[in-house]
Amino acid sequence: MRVQICAVGRLKAAPEKHLLDDYISRLDATGRGIGISALPVCEVEEKRRLQGSELMEREAELLLAAIPKGALIIALDERGRIETSEAFAKRIGTLRDSGAADLAFLIGGANGLAPALRERASHVMAFGAMTWPHMLVRVMLAEQLYRAVTILSGHPYHRA
């Protein structure tokens, strides 16, 4: 199963970018042994000066166009379900075992994800009730994906 993070906005060469790249590399190296690989992080950006719901809808179009066709969508949103790392790993393992080919994690921009995109997702998850900057959410998600594959493979990284 291929896993991709797709987000609105671009990360500059900064500590967050280095952390993201490191966790994606670890995810790919560890996950390959259990049938999970990482696709490059996808970044989309709307150049026109749109506002509010019009901007969110356009960002949703860009996100959907950027992910693999037929990918299962997991949306990150503050209204989503909060899970433990173990439950998240189990979800990833179940999706892999059910034959899912591609899994796309979508992160919205400053206004969040369009409601229609959240409804289209097979799962909506949150990293708590707080709002997080999209730069940090990418790193947090990449780390949790890496943690999930270490849990699934029995690697000692996760100590619960």
From Swiss-Prot:
Alphabetic keyword roster: Cytoplasm, Methyltransferase, rRNA processing, S-adenosyl-L-methionine, Transferase
GO cellular component, one term: cytoplasm
Main subcellular location of this protein, as a coarse class: cytoplasm
Gene3D superfamilies linked to this entry: 3.40.1280.10
EC id: 2.1.1.177
Pfam families named in the record: SPOUT_MTase
Binding site for S-adenosyl-L-methionine: 76, 108, 127-132
UniProt cross-references to SUPFAM superfamilies, sorted A to Z: alpha/beta knot
InterPro entries named among the record's database cross-references: Alpha/beta_knot_MTases, RlmH-like, tRNA_m1G_MTases_N
Cellular localization per UniProt: Cytoplasm
UniProt GO MF annotations: rRNA (pseudouridine-N3-)-methyltransferase activity
Catalytic activity of the protein: pseudouridine(1915) in 23S rRNA + S-adenosyl-L-methionine = N(3)-methylpseudouridine(1915) in 23S rRNA + S-adenosyl-L-homocysteine + H(+)
Enzyme class label: transferase
Entry's family note: Belongs to the RNA methyltransferase RlmH family.
Assembly behavior: Homodimer.
Function (record text): Specifically methylates the pseudouridine at position 1915 (m3Psi1915) in 23S rRNA.
Name used for this protein in its record: Ribosomal RNA large subunit methyltransferase H
Species name: Parvibaculum lavamentivorans (strain DS-1 / DSM 13023 / NCIMB 13966)
